[in-house]
Regions:
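Generic structural signal for small/hydrophobic residues in well-ordered secondary structure
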Residues: 6, 41, 46-50, 69, ...
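Rossmann-like adenosine-cofactor binding region
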Residues: 76-175
């Protein structure tokens, strides 16, 4: 479910759905304003911080769009996902600064731990390209919000979709509410009427995979 939300976030920013909804409030026909914003998802580089279960699903759902995936893990000991091709790669945090300048879309699916706090700080946000987008569906501690706001306001990055924040609910006076190129969800990326059914189905699948592996041993 979270993976579907991320796909929707990226498409909505890249294909102008969210920017159009914002600019239509001020302009009668903002076609010209969107001319320099719209980009294809196909052929882009998506960097996923946190290639665990959620990050794996995000990449799997994005791959059919013809993107290249780079996923960050704590170590390189585990095998790559079965949907990886020769253009995809796994890296660790020590290479993050090298990867960020190549990212068209940055997705954060990290747990909330001391190690992930402000992993995207002012310096790392500054490494992103002007057309880059950010999606955060992990935990709000992973992005330093003031430099994110500054980068969005100055249009040093194209836009961001955030489902999580450092303080939740988001305070009424939050500076993030001023950004016209930032779109927010109230920690709702996993909400669905069929969530419990899908959770049980996924658990059963993982249990079956584990049992099959044990039997092979």
């Amino acid at each position: 479910i979270i993976g579907e939300t991320v796909v929707g976030m990226i498409l909505a920013m890249t294909r102008g759905i969210l920017p159009a909804a914002t600019t239509f409030a001020d302009l009668a026909w903002p076609r010209q304003e969107l001319n320099g914003i719209l980009r294809p998802l196909r052929g882009s580089h998506v960097v996923i911080l946190g290639l665990g279960n959620i990050g794996d699903w995000i990449g799997k759902l994005l791959k059919p769009f013809g993107v290249r995936i780079s996923g960050m893990r704590r170590s390189l000991s585990k095998p790559a996902p079965d949907w990886f091709d020769e253009h995809d790669c796994i890296f660790t945090e020590c290479d993050l600064d090298k990867v960020l300048p190549t990212a068209d879309h940055l997705v954060l699916a990290l747990p909330g731990t001391p190690d992930t706090t402000n992993i995207m700080d002012a310096r790392r946000i500054s490494l992103l390209q002007k057309h880059s987008t950010i999606c955060n569906v992990g935990r709000g501690n992973s992005i330093e919000e003031k430099p994110l706001y500054a980068a969005l306001e100055a249009r040093r990055i194209a836009g961001a979709c955030l489902d999580v924040f450092q303080t939740e609910p988001l305070p009424a006076n939050s500076i993030l509410k001023r950004c016209t190129n930032l779109w927010r969800l109230p920690h709702a990326s996993a909400i669905a009427a069929t969530y419990l059914d899908l959770y049980v189905e996924d658990f059963a699948r993982q249990w079956h995979d584990w049992a099959s592996f044990e039997q092979e041993l």
